[in-house]
Amino acid sequence: KDDVLTLLIHLGYLGYNSSNQTCYIPNKEVIDSFVNSIRSSNWNETTKALLNSRALLEATWNRDEELVAKYIEEAHLDTAILTYNNENALSYTISIAYIYARNHYTIIREMPSGKGYADMVFIPKDDKPAMIVELKWDHEAETAIDQIKEKKYYCGLEKYLDELLLVGISYNKETKEHSCIIERYR
C-alpha cells in the first residue's frame, strides 16, 4: 500500500501533508479523473462497505451506540457466513465491519491482558482513542463491559487510559439483533 502511494506522490497524482502524514488529491483535474473512475467502476459494494466502515468507526468515537449496532447489523447481512451461531462468527463480522480502522489502529485479536484475553484491542497509530472491544453471543452488551472491567483488560494500555473506549457488542440469536454499549474508561 505504501509503495503505491509513494509512487502516486512522485508521479504528481497525490500530494503529501507531512504535518498529519496524509495523502490528498492535489488538483481539480486529478479529482475529476478520480471521481469518473469510481463512477464508471463496478466497486459499488466495496465502496459502500468502506464508507460504512468509516462511518462505524466515527460512530464508535462519538459513542453513538445505536448507530454502531446498525452498522454491525449491516456488516452481518453483507458477510457470507453460513452459520452465524457463535462468538467466532460475530468476531469475523466485527473484523470486517471495522476494516477502515486499520488506517488508524493496530488491531490485536485475543490480546492477553489483565486476567484473560480481550477479544479485540485497537491501539492507535495517531491521536485517536484506544479501544477495547468485547463481544458477547446471546448475552447483554452490558455483560461485555462488565467483563472488560472485572478482568482488567485495560492492563497494558496504561498510556491510553485518558482516551480509552470500552465497547461491548452483543448479538441476540432469538431476536437476531445486535446491541452496543460504549463507555469511556474511568
Model region roles, listed by residue range:
Residues 1-141, 146, 150-152, 163, ...:
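Extended alpha-helical interface modules used as scaffolds for assembling large macromolecular complexes
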Residues 152-156, 162-170:
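Low-complexity, intrinsically disordered Gly/Pro/Thr-rich segments
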Residues 170-177:
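Short, conserved secondary-structure transition motifs
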